[in-house]
């Protein structure tokens, strides 16, 4: 706990291993009464969706809590107990970009679905902006592991916001307050 978190890069500059620090949903759940006694009324989580990195801003799957934090069911239990104590749970939804190692982009073929990087026929292809397919694409601050999405693409909007089972609606139903 006294050393600086680190990561190891490959020859091309890609991160191949991260150090991880921190707690999980069960740990927060165990401390809810204590947090309430301090006057806490809102808990804001940085990204907790499935992701290969320690910062979790390169989402792999918006439908799953990252296993290092717990499960979707544990998230629901946390929200239920927090609500009973008058504490709201707020999620950091990173919807301007995904991870290159995601079910949507799937650069490394780690997912069953055909990602935008793998095929022009992918249902996710139009979510991204390629300048020279497949290797050149718009990405967050030039970080290739975080390809930007076209936030106004109709199918992306439906998946994230407006669809009956959109990501936002799913997590609100699971107990998040925002």
How should each PLM-predicted stretch be described?
Residues 177:
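Receiver (REC) domain switch/active-site residues of two-component response regulators
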């Amino acid at each position: 706990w006294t050393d600086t978190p680190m990561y190891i890069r490959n020859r091309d500059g890609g991160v191949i291993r991260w150090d991880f620090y921190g707690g999980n949903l069960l740990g927060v759940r165990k401390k809810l009464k204590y947090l309430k006694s301090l006057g806490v009324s809102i808990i804001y989580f940085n990204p907790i969706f499935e992701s290969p990195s320690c910062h979790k801003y390169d989402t792999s799957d918006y439908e799953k809590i990252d296993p290092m934090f717990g499960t979707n069911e544990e998230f629901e239990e946390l929200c239920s107990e927090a609500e009973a104590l008058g504490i709201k749970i707020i999620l950091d939804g990173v919807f301007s970009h995904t991870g290159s190692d995601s079910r949507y982009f799937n650069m490394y073929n780690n997912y069953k679905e055909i990602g935008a990087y793998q095929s022009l026929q992918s249902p996710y292809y139009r979510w991204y902006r390629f300048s020279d397919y497949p290797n050149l694409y718009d990405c967050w601050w030039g970080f290739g592991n975080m390809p930007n999405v076209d936030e106004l693409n109709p199918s992306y909007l439906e998946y994230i916001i407006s669809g009956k089972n959109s990501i936002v609606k799913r997590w609100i139903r699971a107990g998040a307050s925002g």
